[in-house]
Amino acid sequence: MSSNSYEVSIPMSKKLNGIPETTSKDLQTLTEGAVLSFHNICYRVKVKTGFLLCRKTIEKEILANINGVMKPGLNAILGPTGGGKSSLLDILAARKDPHGLSGDVLINGAPRPANFKCNSGYVVQDDVVMGTLTVRENLQFSAALRLPTTMTSYEKNERINKVIQELGLDKVADSKVGTQFIRGVSGGERKRTSIAMELITDPSILFLDEPTTGLDSSTANAVLLLLKRMSKQGRTIIFSIHQPRYSIFKLFDSLTLLASGRLMFHGPAQEALGYFGAIGFRCEPYNNPADFFLDIINGDSSAVVLNREDIGDEANETEEPSKKDTPLIEKLAEFYVNSSFFKETKVELDKFSGDQRRKKLPSYKEVTYATSFCHQLKWISRRSFKNLLGNPQASIAQLIVTVFLGLVIGAIFYDLKNDPAGIQNRAGVLFFLTTNQCFSSVSAVELLVVEKKLFIHEYISGYYRVSSYFFGKLLSDLLPMRMLPSIIFTCITYFLLGLKPKVEAFFIMMLTLMMVAYSASSMALAIAAGQSVVSIATLLMTISFVFMMIFSGLLVNLKTVVPWLSWLQYLSIPRYGYAALQHNEFLGQNFCPGLNVTTNNTCSYAICTGEEFLTNQGIDISPWGLWKNHVALACMIVIFLTIAYLKLLFLKKFS
């Protein structure tokens, strides 16, 4: 079979209703857009296999010598699962880790700028938009952080309104996107909102990772019709897709077929059927071309069987045994390399590359920002506050539980007496207050885990700095959600329990509970940062607090702990909080009825004063004995927050 016979075209003349025909004016517009070319793209990753003692690292080839040109229009990357289409898309969008990556990606013949990922648009497969905000509020956030500060608010609002109108979101512009607790817009409208977030910057190149995933056939078709209209405005739209139906396939301008990291076809989508027909794979009538191509690649198509029967005798006579055993994918890749489509692509690639010879892709991890740190901090804090108010289930539930626990504890330990039983009751209730603050702070793990995908996408796209996001979340979520419950808990329990009737003692207790809550929450952030599953972070937090409780000072007298384990007490958050609360409450108290501490009266009780109790517990009764606990908690807050920030900063943000 000669390679020259591959150049066969089967035009797909029928078109969908509602799609305008391409006019000469459209062609002129398309030629003025951005042309992305990729030259000899190879990508390998190192994979660890085997068990712990027998683990070895092997290098796996993901993409091998991929070449092509993406022009203004709809450029589809099609292939089976694991074929490398998402990897190729991420490489073209400069969102793939450059380790193991080689080749060139050019824009109109020039290297991509270092901040290409910030100037282009990228719509991820899972729609990462804030569900508690309206469509317009999400777009306002994108415009505020991605558009230059030289633009006025009026100009930004005009851009937002234009994008809303262009994507047909007028009717739902002021509706919430929706969460699992809040009813919002439809799946198609949510996908269009994700696209609108990227169109705010008016990019010439738009990347989409499987934009039809999770949508029904009608909604998926509507999304692709929208992309088709956008492509006619001169945009280069590049997207991966798994198994489109026929009406969607007909919209494609360019088709790239990948399998096992090899290029099966790259060229005009309407000529793909003709190409495969020319090499012996005939599509049955009424079969979806996209399904037909995937069947060929997977080797389970009737066309493959017919092809093997037709060329079987010829292969037996002319081919060597090693050639007959060549896998189908290898044969298809070889067919394409010998085809006229590949030769035409090489001519275009040589025109773009010119005489420049580049060895490998540079590391495109640079991220640029259109706004300042303070501007980003303001908008992140504002969005987080709106998210808190728009999703009140968690916050209200936490406040209700706080009030309920405060009343229950107040009823159980109501009006503590200054007698020996009061010593035990005070020690018990102060221990409960401390541990309750710790375990209530476990909810802080969700602060960074739930929004991990949103954070990674927005950071790579140049919305904000890591520092802006981190401090914005602290100001809007962590501080109010830990401070308010501590204030409420103190106000309810302090007077019901009948603790020391001094103003300074009341505020010291409130401060101590806040510090314990902040320390525990900071520890939760340090553990949760970078985690993808809330349950894992919660489990680690719970185990840590259980061990900390042992060294808090109630369950075991810390003076009796063996030296080689006693150092663990200095890592216990409850220990510092519990010691501070005991110092604040017991100092100056008299627990022996009728005992005059100013005289030499004797008493039958082992402990009569608060000082004696504190000394027995190994607590320093000096003023520094109180405040050193707050200093220790403050140091732990700084250390844990630093760990959380560094984990966010060095989080693997590129796939």
Curated annotation (Swiss-Prot):
Subunit relationships: Homodimer; disulfide-linked. The minimal functional unit is a homodimer, but the major oligomeric form in plasma membrane is a homotetramer with possibility of higher order oligomerization up to homododecamers.
Residue pairs linked by disulfide bridges in the UniProt entry: C592-C608
Catalytic activity: ATP + H2O + xenobioticSide 1 = ADP + phosphate + xenobioticSide 2; urate(in) + ATP + H2O = urate(out) + ADP + phosphate + H(+); indoxyl sulfate(in) + ATP + H2O = indoxyl sulfate(out) + ADP + phosphate + H(+); sphing-4-enine 1-phosphate(in) + ATP + H2O = sphing-4-enine 1-phosphate(out) + ADP + phosphate + H(+)
Protein name: Broad substrate specificity ATP-binding cassette transporter ABCG2
Chain ranges passing through the membrane: 396-416, 429-449, 478-498, 507-527, 536-556, 631-651
One record GO biological process: transmembrane transport
Gene Ontology MF: a single term: riboflavin transmembrane transporter activity
Species name: Bos taurus (Bovine)
Keywords, sorted A to Z: ATP-binding, Cell membrane, Disulfide bond, Glycoprotein, Lipid transport, Membrane, Mitochondrion, Nucleotide-binding, Phosphoprotein, Translocase, Transmembrane, Transmembrane helix, Transport
Residue ranges of domain ABC transporter in the record: 36-285
Homology family: Belongs to the ABC transporter superfamily. ABCG family. Eye pigment precursor importer (TC 3.A.1.204) subfamily.
Alphabetized SUPFAM superfamilies for the sequence: P-loop containing nucleoside triphosphate hydrolases
Pfam families: ABC2_membrane, ABC2_membrane_7, ABC_tran
Cited function: Broad substrate specificity ATP-dependent transporter of the ATP-binding cassette (ABC) family that actively extrudes a wide variety of physiological compounds, dietary toxins and xenobiotics from cells. Involved in porphyrin homeostasis, mediating the export of protoporphyrin IX (PPIX) from both mitochondria to cytosol and cytosol to extracellular space, it also functions in the cellular export of heme. Also mediates the efflux of sphingosine-1-P from cells. Acts as a urate exporter functioning in both renal and extrarenal urate excretion.
InterPro entries attached to this UniProt entry: AAA+_ATPase, ABC2_TM, ABC_transporter-like_ATP-bd, ABCG_dom, ABCG_transporters, P-loop_NTPase
Chain positions carrying an annotated carbohydrate: N596, N600
Ranges for domain ABC transmembrane type-2: 389-651
Coarse class of the protein's main subcellular location: membrane
Topology with respect to the bilayer: Multi-pass membrane protein
SMART domains: AAA
PANTHER family to which the protein is assigned, alphabetical: ABC TRANSPORTER G FAMILY MEMBER 28, BROAD SUBSTRATE SPECIFICITY ATP-BINDING CASSETTE TRANSPORTER ABCG2
Primary gene name: ABCG2
Compartment(s): Cell membrane; Apical cell membrane; Mitochondrion membrane
Known EC number: 7.6.2.2
Binding positions for ATP per the UniProt entry: 79-86, 183-189, 210, 242
GO cellular component, one term: brush border membrane
